[in-house]
Amino acid sequence: MSSHPAPAPPVHDVPMPEPRRDLTPAMFTVISQVRARLAGRPELATLFTQCFPNTWQTTLEDLPEGRTFVQTGDIPAMWLRDSAAQVSPYLALCAADPEVRRTVAGVLLQQAHLLETDPYANAFNREPGNEYHFDVPAPGPWVWERKFELDSLCSVLWLAWRLWRATGELPLDLRPTLERILEVMETEQDHDGRSDYRFERPAEYCVLPSDTLVRGGRGAAHAPTGMVWSGFRPSDDACTYPYLVPANMFAAVVLRQAAQLVRELYGDAELAGRAEALAADIREGIETHGVTEHPEFGRVYAYETDGLGHWLLMDDANVPSLLAAPYLGYCRADDPTYLNTRRMILSDANPHYHVGEHAAGIGSAHTPGRRIWPIALCMQALTAQDTPEGRAEVVALLDTLARTTAGTGLMHESFDPDAPDTYSRPWFAWANSLLAETVLTRLDVIAERV
């Protein structure tokens, strides 16, 4: 009998380091101002004080050529999506704080560099390695994982747009990056006809069946819709139907933003027009193929569709999500179809919506069982309407978040709504940054109800 261990998926549980980067004076000012406004909510004030600097102090590393590596947390890799979200609460400081501007600009430089390395990968290594060497085809040495997630491309443009709006400049010429993104998206509008992308993971290395794609790595059967095909969701789970509506919503928004950017910054009307045309195709595809009638909730957005008459009616905590559509800029928070969709996904009609003794909210297939994700609770607060009921919802959600940290003072990936001391991923920087962003965005609402 062989003495070699049986093949198994990699396990990662990197401990959170002590703070390794000093806060800037502007960051101290933000923390002081928020704490003063939340003097009547000490739990939430403490939570913000620990979450706001978490990405800055524990996940960032300076690289050559002005680039910045952003570790996701207890997994030692950089996700394009996570890294953009992790630095999101610092963007408002970029105009006046040179160190924050340099660091966030370095994140964008690194993202553009990684896209050039492999535009189909979702996560990358700090140094050459091959953690998932068993995937088919095998990823390159700088690639942590090569799951094609449409929102990865969107996140780079999202960060570029917001940095440009905050500072009036960018650390690179964005046009080659945008051209590469357009090339991939246009190809994936006709995945079966034009794309060479495949992804398979041997069963013995899959944590969940959704770690691989069906049909020999091509994903589920589908027909062209104008939307962009995505193999995987932002949860890193395979799509059931390969037109992921929230990711396409994100794409429709960031492509129009990118068009404005390249037109105003570079005077490039041709590239801007190409991005706008793709954005229009995607939006038309969403509104034609990504909407269906629900017997209880009426006209709603589906989470996924295949262009063949099938719709998956659910939502997942990870962003982009249907819940996040107004946050992404796709629609207003009072849009009728969005409100119908919101009612659906915040009910037991969504298989990932859970109600427990201590919390109610959306979870993910990525964490099977009754688990709620703080990211979803934050997004619910960020997209609540500016009405008395909506403001009360915001306050209740943030109070829930402050009470369900298991005494750690930080956000986690997920927790049991009946026993919040049971949670996953003690160091998950994306969730910490989104909590900070939620408090900053909703501070007037929270403070008025102290």
PLM regions with names:
Residues 2-81:
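Low-complexity, Ser/Thr/Pro/Gly-enriched N-terminal "stalk/linker" regions
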Residues 47, 98-114, 169-188, 258, ...:
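Extended, well-ordered alpha-helical scaffold segments
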Residues 135-141, 146-149, 312-332, 370-450:
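C-terminal capping/lid segments that line or modulate ligand- or cofactor-binding pockets
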Residues 80, 116-120, 124-127, 131, ...:
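Extended ligand-binding clefts on enzyme/binding-domain cores
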Residues 76-104, 108-209, 429-443:
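Aromatic-rich carbohydrate-recognition surfaces in CAZymes
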